[in-house]
Amino acid sequence: MRVPIENRIGKEGEGFGLAQTWINAGRIRHGARSLGVMERCLELAIGYAKQRKTFGVPLAQRQSIQWPIVDMQMDAHKLRLMLHHVAWKFDRGEDCRQEAFMVKIFGDERSFWTADRCMQIHGGMGLSKELPIERFFRDQRSMMITEGAIEVLRMALARMILDVK
């Protein structure tokens, strides 16, 4: 298809570079969305763990509940810091492909894991449509495919890091 010159975005031959910039922005947004899911899952898991009792003891006092919540909190903090860094580089117009890949891979994988753990903490209620957890679980699984499948991004990131073809 021929595009009239007045409708061209950028200069001739620079389309791929522009597309990479837009794709990087999408991967950064993936990370931000993943962080939002992680934070909401944490709120739900913490609230439920404090309220729900089994055998007279709140779930929050059980190590099998505490440790995943700690890991969820640490992962959210890591992703938040990664997002600040990649957004800073992106805003400055610096090359941030590696960081954008890492944010997408880490964010998608860990937000899916967080939704899974939140679902597990809630037991059967985590599967119900009354709570947003089952939707987070499904949505975050699909995020690992869109804007670049995480396996492909991991392979491309390895090539960048190792400087191999």
Provide a role label for each language-model segment.
Residues 5, 12-165:
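Alpha-helical interface subdomain recognition
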Residues 1-3:
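Short Ser/Thr-interspersed hydrophobic loop/turn segments at strand-loop and sheet-helix junctions
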